[in-house]
């Protein structure tokens, strides 16, 4: 009788652990955040300067110079 109780308790504990890990992993993934962008400079883009302006303005943004030499700042929408 005691052996079956320990086995049942162990099984319940394993199932509970798997469920908790699944919920935690799902929360970590979350929904992908929407990406926004804005033009910071219309011409003569310099990559380092563009990235610096973007980080200064948006915090976790990333600056990118387009082939037409515009400076775009990409960031997660608020």
Curated annotation (Swiss-Prot):
Disulfide bonding pattern of the chain: 36-77, 45-65, 50-71, 54-73
Superkingdom of the organism of origin: Eukaryota
InterPro entries recorded: DEFL
GO biological process, one term: defense response to fungus
UniProt main location, coarse: secreted
Keywords: Antimicrobial, Disulfide bond, Fungicide, Plant defense, Secreted, Signal
Locations listed in the record: Secreted
Signal sequence interval, chain numbering: 1-25
Family: Belongs to the DEFL family.
UniProt name for this protein: Defensin-like protein 149
């Amino acid at each position: 009788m005691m052996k079956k109780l320990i086995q049942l308790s162990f099984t319940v504990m394993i199932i509970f652990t798997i469920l908790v890990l699944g919920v935690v992993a799902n929360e970590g993934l979350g929904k992908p955040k929407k990406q926004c962008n804005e033009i910071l400079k219309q011409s003569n883009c310099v990559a380092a300067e563009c990235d610096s302006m973007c980080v200064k303005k948006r915090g976790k943004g990333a600056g990118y110079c387009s082939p037409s030499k515009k400076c775009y700042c990409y960031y997660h929408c608020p």
